[in-house]
Structure formats: C-alpha cells, structure tokens
Regions:
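A domain-level signal for the structural core that forms small-molecule/cofactor-binding pockets
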Residues: 2-72
C-alpha cells in the first residue's frame, strides 16, 4: 500500500528506471509520512503504437489527477 504503476515509452536504461522508482518512493514516503516498505513501484514500457490501446484507454478519467498531451 500503495503501489505506483508507471507506463512509459521504451528507451530508458535500467539505472534511469531505478532512479524514477526510488524518487517516486521517496516522495510518497515524505508526503504520506510512511516507511519505504509501504510502497512498491513498477515500470512498464509500452511501444508508441500500442499506447492508446494499452494505456490511454485504461486510464479512468475520474482517477487522473494530472493530464498530459498523450493522456487527457
């Protein structure tokens, strides 16, 4: 509790993905005042041509707090 799921285009190396995960975890620790073992983070790479069917169609607009040019 909670789990953060990141979906993004391919191309980042493992070190960058690890840094993304650690930064997200650290911010949640700070914001929620909870220890690291409360949070899990996954990163899934999605090809641009599969983005709409894999990501955009699955995101519930009521759950979307920040939009982007790709997911609105």
């Amino acid at each position: 509790m909670p789990h953060i799921s990141v979906m993004m285009y391919p191309g980042r190396d493992e070190a960058t993905k690890e840094l993304i995960a650690k930064n997200l975890q650290a911010e949640l620790m700070r914001t929620m005042n909870a220890p690291a073992n409360f949070f899990s983070v996954s990163i899934e790479e999605v090809a641009p041509e599969k983005w709409d069917e894999t990501v955009a169609a699955k995101v519930a607009h009521d759950d979307l707090y920040i939009t982007s040019d790709i997911v609105k």
